[in-house]
C-alpha cells in the first residue's frame, strides 16, 4: 500500500505541471496536464459512444476514458515537452521510460493494465487507442479554439493540424462543429433575462 500511496502523491504533481505547447504562441495562463487529461478523458468517452451509435460497434467508453486519464502520467518526471523541445529530446522514449518506472511500484495486474493502456494510446493498435488519441488531439484543439476566440490568431495552427490528424468519423464531425462555435456560446442562452410576475410587479431574474 505504501507504494500505491506514493504513486498517488506523484501523479498529483500533474496539477502543477503546465501543458506547455501554447507557451510558444505567447499564452501565459497555461492549463495543467491534469486539466488536459480530465477533459480529454471526457471527450474520449463521448467519442466512443458516438462511434458505437454510428457504426454499431461495442467499443468500451470506460476503457477509452481510462487510457486517457493515465496517458500523461510520465510527464510528472520529464515535464510536458512541446514540439520544439522534441526536436532535441526523444520525448516519446523518455516518457515511456518514466511511465514504465512509475508502474513498477504498483501491483502486477494493475501495472500490466496501465502498460496496456499506454501501448494502445501510443501505437493506436486498437479501436480504443485510436479513439483515445483522437480525443487527446481534440482536447488540444478545443483549448486552441478558446485562445483563438480570445484574440490569439496563431492558435489556428493547432486546430488545423489536429483536423488533419483525426481518424474517427465522430472526431472529424466534432472539430468541424467546434470551428463554427465560439467557446462562450454554451452560456449565452443561460444568461437571457427571465421575468417572473410577483404581486403585480415584474421582477428580473438571471441578470448576473
Describe the role of every protein-language-model region.
Residues 1-208:
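Alpha-helical, largely C-terminal catalytic domains
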